[in-house]
Amino acid sequence: MNEDIKNNLNNSDESNGKIIVGLDEAGRGPVIGPMVIASVKINEKDLPRLDDLGLRDSKQLSKKKREELYTKISEICDVKKVVINPEKIDEQMEIINLNKIELGAFSKLANHFIKENENISIYIDACSSNEQSFSNQFKAKLINKNVEIIAEHKADENYKIVSAASIIAKVTRDNVIEEYKKTFGEIGSGYPSDPKTKKFLKNYVHENKGLPKIARKSWATSKNLLKEIEESKIFQWVK
């Protein structure tokens, strides 16, 4: 995991109030690019400053608006990110599932803040269908089991602090995708359902007889393309 840490919270006395942390991810499902886990920390007394930004789930915002909010959130909050590249995802998927990969990154970020603060509440977008099970698994990985945890589906829509984390994660991943395009050309959004992404991968695999390093080899889309290549080789040999 690569970490990108940005600490530019205004230096308010955090001992004077509860610390609020929001956690969310971007890039869970794509076949191309990293999964980004983001955390946003703020003193509870400063929450009105987030409310004033008019935050929503990142998926409901335009690219331009997300980028504007990314800057404003970074000025108000302490932001921390974990970027898990495709190679690392593939490596971990051999022994654990995607939920556990995500849980590991969530707990890594949460523990960073828990070390510094005892009076803390953590809001997190539950990546499991069972909210309570997810909350229990998350808590088991924390260095302080007494912190307050609010783990819910659609937390990015219901809590501004999680919306902020969602925006940080989404913009970070989008920036990585833009960097990829400088090398590989048009690759689309990276999602398997995106026609541009499917076209890019298919052309790349057929031209290079393998997947690009930016693709997740453990995804069904990737496996199917590689299978096509193998079947094509067999057909040519038989022919």
From Swiss-Prot:
Residues involved in a divalent metal cation binding: 24-25, 125
Gene Ontology terms for molecular function: manganese ion binding; RNA binding; RNA-DNA hybrid ribonuclease activity
Disulfide bridge partners, by residue number: none
GO cellular component, one term: ribonuclease H2 complex
Catalytic activity as recorded in UniProt: Endonucleolytic cleavage to 5'-phosphomonoester
Enzyme Commission numbers on file: 3.1.26.4
A Pfam family assignment: RNase_HII
InterPro entries: RNase_H2_suA, RNase_HII/HIII, RNase_HII/HIII_dom, RNase_HII_arc, RNase_HII_hlx-loop-hlx_cap_dom, RNaseH-like_sf, RNaseH_sf
The entry's keywords: Cytoplasm, Endonuclease, Hydrolase, Manganese, Metal-binding, Nuclease
EC supergroup of this enzyme: hydrolase
Cofactor remark: Manganese or magnesium. Binds 1 divalent metal ion per monomer in the absence of substrate. May bind a second metal ion after substrate binding.
Gene3D superfamilies found in the cross-reference section: Ribonuclease H-like superfamily/Ribonuclease H, Ribonuclease hii. Domain 2
Keyword Lipoprotein: no
Cofactor(s) recorded in Swiss-Prot or TrEMBL: Mn(2+); Mg(2+)
Protein family: Belongs to the RNase HII family.
Record function comment: Endonuclease that specifically degrades the RNA of RNA-DNA hybrids.
The protein's name in its UniProt record: Ribonuclease HII
Species classification: Archaea, Methanobacteriati, Methanobacteriota, Methanomada group, Methanococci
